[in-house]
Amino acid sequence: EKLCYVALDFEQEMQTAASSSSLEKSYELPDGQVITTGNERFRAPESLYQPSFLGMESSGIHETTYNSIMMCDVDIRKDLYANTVLSGGSTIFPGIADRMQKEITSLAPPTMKIKIIAPPERKYSVWIGGSILASLSTFQQMWISKQEYDESGP
């Protein structure tokens, strides 16, 4: 996690890793053992864009984002493209905002302005948002008991 990053161009990065050791980094494990990582640094987070690397038949994060926007009313799509906010721990990888910008731009209409927002506090944004929502008095009417949950499920 500390050494990983998202490649802007995965294939180009693979070629660079194959022809040079410039992408290699050493890391000391808690037991003192030192390991060297190469293309693993960007291959691991690439599964966010290519879940097939993990044997999953699902869309990448960029396609899921695009599909979500396209399912919204046509009148708000422009605003969604211009205000896509990254949140959660998986968005902490360096390079993820630039890659999302590139991928969404390639999927969206050519004249569309794309802006990916990666706030510094995004690692905890999901928790903070849930905390704010849970503290609203209007949200309390949506609460259910454990017994209700056990009976009806999610």
UniProtKB/Swiss-Prot annotation:
UniProt entry tagged with the keyword Cytoplasm: yes
Entries under PROSITE patterns matching the protein: ACTINS_2
The protein's enzyme class: hydrolase
Catalytic activity: ATP + H2O = ADP + phosphate + H(+)
Superkingdom in the source lineage: Eukaryota
Transmembrane regions listed in the UniProt entry: none
Keyword annotations: ATP-binding, Cytoplasm, Cytoskeleton, Hydrolase, Nucleotide-binding
GO annotation, cellular component aspect: cytoplasm; cytoskeleton
GO terms of molecular function: ATP binding; hydrolase activity
Pfam families: Actin
EC number: 3.6.4.-
Compartments where found: Cytoplasm; Cytoplasm, Cytoskeleton
Family: Belongs to the actin family.
PANTHER family from the UniProt entry: ACTIN
Role this protein plays: Actins are highly conserved proteins that are involved in various types of cell motility and are ubiquitously expressed in all eukaryotic cells.
Record-given protein name: Actin, cytoskeletal 4
